[in-house]
Curated annotation (Swiss-Prot):
The LRR repeats probably act as specificity determinant of pathogen recognition. GO terms for biological process: defense response to oomycetes. It comes from Arabidopsis thaliana (Mouse-ear cress). Disruption phenotype: Compromised RPP7-dependent immunity leading to an increased sporulation of the incompatible Hyaloperonospora arabidopsidis (downy mildew) Hpa-Hiks1 isolate, but normal resistance to Hpa-Cala2 and Hpa-Cand5 isolates in cv. Col-5 background; full susceptibility to these isolates is observed in cv. Wassilewskija background. Induction: In cv. Columbia, regulated epigenetically by EDM2 (e.g. alternative polyadenylation (APA) resulting from cooption of epigenetic information at the TE insertion locus COPIA-R7) to accumulate upon Hyaloperonospora arabidopsidis isolate Hiks1 infection. LRR repeats lie at residues 544-565, 566-581, 582-606, 607-631, 655-680, 681-705, 707-726, 727-752, 754-774, 775-797, 798-825, 847-871, 873-893, 894-918, 940-963, 1028-1050, 1055-1078, 1079-1103, 1115-1138. Residues 166-422 form the NB-ARC domain. This is Protein RECOGNITION OF PERONOSPORA PARASITICA 7.
Length: 1138
């Protein structure tokens, strides 16, 4: 395999010498001789690659060739850049600094001669070791030819890998839907067995999605961080409307304690299914599980190679162990992938190939992953001869008869997976090895990956009939997906592969091969020792999740070509001198905090750089020397918004190779950037007329993605003339922030036939006719358009539209009509800020696939369409509308699961029997006019979560809710005692959350089976413990600003099941805990209670207590030797919190 990678490098060097031949004037003879030597060298490499496994001497020769070729490429490419850029201001001085590498033309001639001699010597050595000369094909066919040759091995759906799993899925779904006895289910078995596939089928099963109102999927991995796992779970469980960048940032900034508290509360109040995929150790589960409350609303599915993850003594736990596929099922799976046909009559399997296939799948040991990879590999081989060769390779490796299902199964499967790598063409080997940069279970952005590949010239778009880098990257990912080596699916809105990742076992192969080839050096915590510096010999270096990186101290490898940081948060860049890294092609400093906010001017010395990313980095000043980087194809300056004022010099016009450019969102107004020369751009983000001229866009005819801010005064004619010729656009966003542009009566006409996503925030009183809209449009967002005519008759004819958002002031009319059969593909409709809209008519069969409807701040809308609101709606949010009583219309929607009503104006709300048959969650917020709510028997039979906020005139809850498990009440000051929870109602209620109620209900009005109670902002005068401690099943209590008295007592025998108690911001002075109170308490948190004189003496009798978190002011008293240490000395963990 190394031979093929070296052959790839040889071809790159050949290309350099051929394409830049005119620059080698004066050394033409030496160049011609070197090219001849390279041709001869290529003819030996294939046989050398085959023999390196059995000969250490041949292996040494291959490694020496790699060094020769890479060194030659570094020197000759620097020479080429010297010739190209030597006359550019600032470059001549820099090139002189490279005299140690490329001094002058005479010495370059001597160097080329030296390289030729080294090649001659290594060829002679290989011949003496028995390596033979062979005729080889070109290393890479043009993309178009390969596309014609590629056999389409997969159907459009992904059922090809779904063999013999139906019964397992059915059984597992039963544990989550029908069985209440099991709260935790694990799927365990060896890698590649299909555990994740099985879990995914359960996670997406219709019965499961109907059962739970919240779902979260988190990949844990071998080297996970607890904080990251909790962040991902919280991100999945948060309500959809909160999924903003601000919310994401808030979650990322949470401490572990805050995350644990948020998740604990969220899981107590919801019916959730959490999947933790790929847990490695029992200890990992032990540190994750504190977020799970003792209540029964949640369920957990684990996958692991370790059967002892959860203690089997837990009666709520069940372990499911799938078996390897039997021979017949193995053959069925293999056949679906290696011979993908819809009709058996279309294709007859060659008898010899069938026998060879049956023989080879024996080595897969019934592992689905190994079978799929083998099938994908053989699907690319067309002849019996190819199949025989692969069969012999497998057989020769597995000596000693290791072919039995149970005989060294892992070794057999690992070799099958390794062989799939060996069978890749050389360009795909490089692509695959690049995936070793990323941590386990990391979602890799395919767009970034494509530009990494292009920057290292793994592919060169100029070879492929004008294809853009993103297109070529998609083709390569598709080939790896087809071979079952990479996991990814095309996004339905963009038709592209947006993210990808590796199966665990394929990642092990990837890391192993990358290590064998010295392809990449991986480190997680950058050491600054000379010992580390001396060990970094790879030409690629990646830091995973660093906290600090000092370039000068941590990196000392002048041959380094790629430096990449992979992180989920910000990190400190202590030093940014790149003077020793002048051969870098790729530099990714995502989310770096640069010292002083300045990018060092020495960045301009990296003249080989093709990829530079400062995405979300904290930097305010970009140096003028950036203009030296003439070879950049990717430049991301979308820096952190915390950098309010950013200086970018006008040096970008010389970067004529740029394909991707993201500018800062905020640039100093005085800065003017000339961009007209960047005609090869494929993506341009954050273009602003404040800093650039619209006319610069005219020549960027290759653009696929364009986002524009119109700030300076402009005209529609200028805009149309500037972007009208960009016919390949797929995504366009135009935001008018003060251009005072006014459109003509006919609206804006864009002839973008490939456009899929369009966002317009500008004045546009008329829409173009539907024939002028791109026919492939899938996503449309309109805002501030002030459309005078109903937009629906035009928009509903966009046959591919899946998401439509009519934002603030997008329509100024009164009536909208959605016609019969209109919007045939629409799945999500959002309407907000339409001040004059008052009438909405929906005809039968309109929007037949609509799932989500959001209407916000449309105060004149009095009612919803009575008859033909799409019946498949599953989620509806209505806020700040003039609707008086939408319930009669909504309760007929038989698939509705989530309903949120906020700031409506009705006085009475009646839910009739049989209505809302599938509703799981109901949120009523700020219904100021609501005085009475009636729920008839049989209404909302599946409702398990009810949230009521600031419904000030509503005095009590209605009867009913037989399945309700979570009740959340906020600001119910006027409710009568006893009306919060009526005795005998809500028999399954286990979580109660009350905020701002001046009086605590009597104990007879609390359901006796409550397990969780949160009291917030109540300031009740009487001791709440007197009532709460009598709730025999209570396991979690949280009191926040909920007691205004001075003394609280927990009586002996009280709180018999309590496990967690949290008390914050209470003015109490004395707390007494009698012996025998809270005998099962394991976690106690006391925060910001400044008047509490001392912790109760009774804590020393709570032997179950494992975790105590208190204010730092208690540290002296509770530490060893302190006066109250005796109260807490038995507690394993005592933390002092701010």
């Amino acid at each position: 395999m190394a031979g093929e990678l070296v052959s790839f490098a040889v071809n790159k060097l050949w290309d350099l010498l051929s394409h830049e031949y005119t620059l080698f004037q004066g050394v033409e003879d030496q160049v011609a001789e070197l090219k001849s030597d390279l041709n001869l060298l290529k003819s030996f490499l294939k046989d050398a690659d085959a023999k390196k496994h059995t000969s250490a001497l041949v292996r040494y020769c291959v490694e020496e060739i790699k060094d020769i070729v890479y060194d030659a490429e570094d020197v000759l490419e620097t020479f080429v850049q010297k010739e190209k850029l030597g006359t550019t201001s600032g470059i001549r001085k820099h090139i002189k600094r490279l005299t140690c590498i490329v001094p002058d033309r005479r010495e370059i001639a001597l160097y080329i001669g030296h390289v030729s001699k080294r090649i001659t010597r290594v060829i002679r050595d290989m011949q003496s070791f028995g390596v033979q000369q062979m005729i080889v094909d070109d290393y890479m066919h043009p993309l178009r030819n390969r596309e014609r040759e590629i056999r389409r091995t997969f159907p459009k759906d992904n059922e090809s890998g779904f063999v013999a799993l139906e019964e397992n899925v059915k059984k597992l779904v039963g544990y989550f839907v029908e069985e209440d006895n099991y709260q935790v289910v694990s799927i365990t078995g060896m890698g590649g067995l299909g555990k994740t596939t099985l879990a995914r089928q359960v996670f997406n099963h219709d019965m499961v999605t109907k059962k739970f109102d919240k779902l979260a999927w988190v990949s844990v991995s071998q080297d996970f961080t607890l904080k990251n796992v909790w962040q991902n779970i919280l991100g999945d469980l948060k309500p959809k409307e909160e999924e903003t960048k601000e919310e994401e940032k808030k979650i990322l900034e949470m401490t572990e304690y805050t995350l644990q508290r948020e998740l604990y509360q969220l899981l107590e109040m919801s019916k959730s299914l959490i999947v933790l995929d790929d847990i490695w150790k029992k200890e990992d589960w032990e540190v994750i599980k504190p977020i799970f409350p003792p209540t029964k609303g949640w369920k957990l599915l684990l996958t692991s190679r370790n059967e002892s993850i959860v203690a089997p003594t837990n009666t709520k736990y069940f372990n499911f162990k799938p078996e390897c596929l039997k021979t017949d099922d193995s053959w069925k799976l293999f056949q679906r992938i290696a011979f993908p046909i819809n009709d058996a009559s279309e294709f007859e399997i060659d008898e010899e190939m069938e026998k060879l296939g049956e023989k080879m799948i024996e080595h897969c040991g019934g592992l689905p992953l190994a079978i799929k990879v083998l099938g994908g590999m053989l699907a690319e081989k067309y002849t019996s001869h190819d199949w025989r060769r692969l069969s012999e390779n497998i057989g020769s490796h597995l000596v000693g008869g290791r072919t039995n299902f149970n005989d060294d199964n892992n070794n057999s499967c690992n070799y099958v997976l390794s062989l799939s790598f060996e069978e890749l063409p050389s360009y795909l080997k490089h692509c695959f090895l690049y995936l070793a940069h990323f941590p386990e279970d990391y979602e890799i952005k395919v767009e970034n990956l494509s530009y990494y590949w292009a920057a290292e010239e793994i592919f060169q778009p100029r070879h492929y009939d004008g294809e853009i880098i993103r297109d070529v990257g998609d083709v390569y990912i598709e080939e790896l997906v087809r071979r079952n080596m990479v996991i990814s699916e095309r996004d339905v809105k963009t038709s592209r592969f947006e993210t990808c990742h590796l199966h665990d076992m394929m990642r092990e192969v990837c890391l192993l091969k990358a290590k064998e080839e010295n392809f990449l050096q991986i480190t997680s915590n950058p050491p600054s020792t000379a010992n580390f510096q001396s060990t970094v010999t790879s030409r690629r270096l990646v830091y995973q999740y660093p906290t600090t990186l000092h370039v000068e101290k941590d990196i000392n490898n002048p041959k380094l070509r790629s430096l990449v940081v992979v992180t989920l948060g910000s990190w400190n860049m202590a030093g940014s001198s790149f003077t020793r890294l002048e051969l870098l092609r790729v530099l990714d400093l995502v989310q770096a905090k640069l010292k002083g906010g300045k990018l060092a001017s020495c960045i301009g010395k990296l003249i080989h750089l093709r990829y530079l990313s400062l995405e979300y980095a904290e930097v305010t000043h970009i140096p003028y020397s950036l203009g030296n980087l003439k070879l950049l194809i990717y430049l991301n300056l979308h820096i952190s918004l915390s950098s309010r004022s950013n200086f970018v010099p006008n040096v970008l016009m010389g970067m004529q190779e740029l394909r991707y450019l993201a500018l800062p969102s905020l640039i100093e107004r005085k800065t003017k950037l000339e961009l007209s020369n960047l005609v090869k751009l494929e993506t341009l983000e954050n273009f602003s007329t404040k800093n650039s001229s619209l006319e610069d866009l005219r020549g960027m005819v290759r653009l696929r993605t364009l986002t524009i801010e119109l700030i300076e005064e402009t005209s529609l004619e200028t805009l149309a003339a500037s972007i009208g010729g960009l016919k390949y656009l797929e995504k366009l966003e135009i935001d008018d922030l003060g251009s005072k542009m006014r459109t003509k009566e006919a609206g804006i006409v864009f002839d973008f036939v490939h456009l899929k996503r369009l966002r317009l925030e500008l004045y546009m009183p008329r829409l173009s006719k539907e024939q002028h809209f791109p026919s492939h449009l899938t996503t449309l967002y309109l805002q501030h358009c002030r459309l005078e005519e109903d937009p629906m008759p035009i928009l509903e004819k966009l046959l591919q539209l899946k998401e439509l958002e009519l934002g603030h002031k997008s329509f100024s009319g009164k009536k909208m009509v959605c016609s019969s059969c209109g919007f045939p593909q629409l799945q999500k409709l959002s309407i907000s800020g339409l001040k004059e809209w008052e009438d909405w008519k929906v005809e039968e069969s309109s929007m037949p696939l609509l799932l989500t409807l959001n209407i916000f701040d449309c105060r004149k809308l009095k009612q919803l369409p009575d008859e033909h609101l799409p019946s498949h709606l599953t989620a509806i949010s209505l806020k700040k509308c003039g609707l008086e009583d939408p319930i009669p219309t909504l309760e007929r929607l038989v698939h509705l699961k989530e309903l949120s009503l906020s700031e409506l104006c009705g006085r009475i709300m009646v839910c009739t029997g049989g209505g809302f048959p599938q509703l799981h969650k109901l949120d009523l917020s700020e219904l100021d006019g609501l005085e009475e709510w009636i729920v008839e028997d049989g209404s909302m039979p599946r409702l398990h979560t009810l949230e009521i906020r600031r419904c000030l005139k509503l005095k009590k809850l209605p009867n009913g809710f037989p399945q309700l498990q979570n009740l959340h009440l906020t600001e119910v000051e006027e409710w009568e005692e006893g009306m919060i929870v009526k005795q005998g109602s809500m028999p399954l209620l286990h979580t109660l959350y009350i905020w701002h109620c001046p009086k605590l209900p009597g104990e007879q009005h609390f359901p006796s089976h409550l397990t969780t109670v949160f009291l917030l902002g109540m300031y009740v005068e009487e001791d709440p413990m007197r009532i709460l401690e009598k709730l025999l099943h209570l396991k979690n209590v949280s009191l926040f600003q909920s007691f205004s008295g001075k003394r609280m007592v927990c009586s002996g025998g009280g709180f018999p099941q309590l496990q967690k108690l949290s008390i914050r911001e209470i003015e109490w002075e004395e707390w007494i805990v009698e012996q025998g109170s809270m005998p099962l308490l394991h976690t106690l948190y006391i925060g910001v209670c400044p008047n509490l004189k001392e912790l109760p003496d009774g804590l020393r009798f709570i032997y179950s207590l494992k975790n105590l978190i208190v204010s730092k002011r208690w540290k002296k008293r509770l530490s060893e030797g302190g006066e109250d240490y005796y109260k807490v000395q038995h507690i394993p963990s005592v933390e002092f919190d701010d």
